[in-house]
Amino acid sequence: MILLTAEAENTIPVGCTADGLPLLVNRDSPLPDDYQPQQLVNMRDYCDSSIVSIKGSEIEGEQIAVDALLAMLMQAQSEGLTSWQISAGYRSVAYQQKLFDDKVYSYRQQGMTGAQARSAARKLVAEPGCSEHHTGLAFDITVPGTSFGGTKQAKWLEEHCWEWGFILRYPADKTAITGITNEPWHFRYVGVDAAMEMRETGECLEEYVERKQSE
């Protein structure tokens, strides 16, 4: 994996590899230990609270993705879809480790062996270093008091998110490929061109990157 360097930052989009493809982060493609987002912003300070609420005071995101996110939610609001909330953005590896360990522990409490608990946890929580949230380009978008999937807001995002460079990262019909169960709230910024192409082909990010690398 060849990542964006400081010398190339003016020509390669944020969150892309040197060949211009969106950065793929999963269990098989973990981020390098020294990976750092380029320009994180505190979303509570940065975002207009009349458009979206931020759950907690420390949620951050890569600025280019946050700008696109705000523009997208402003459009949704203009169409009568409100009550947006961001419940997760950038996560450090240490915090992701805690989330994963907590999930493993909960399964162990249900009687699973260590191996069984880790296997079950991986389907719901990415292992440290393997989470898209480390990039600052992924956000959990919710509506307070709902399970989000099936809401008008969720349906609108799935239909229109590509227009602002986002993809629904873990759709229900791609679980066998992504290795993650359906997450209707998890959206990843990949840029408009890539998002539009994935919408046209019906590919998830794993399929898209594999195809582009083989061309």
In which residue ranges do the predicted regions lie?
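Extracytoplasmic cell-surface/polysaccharide-interacting catalytic and binding patches
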Residues: 1-215
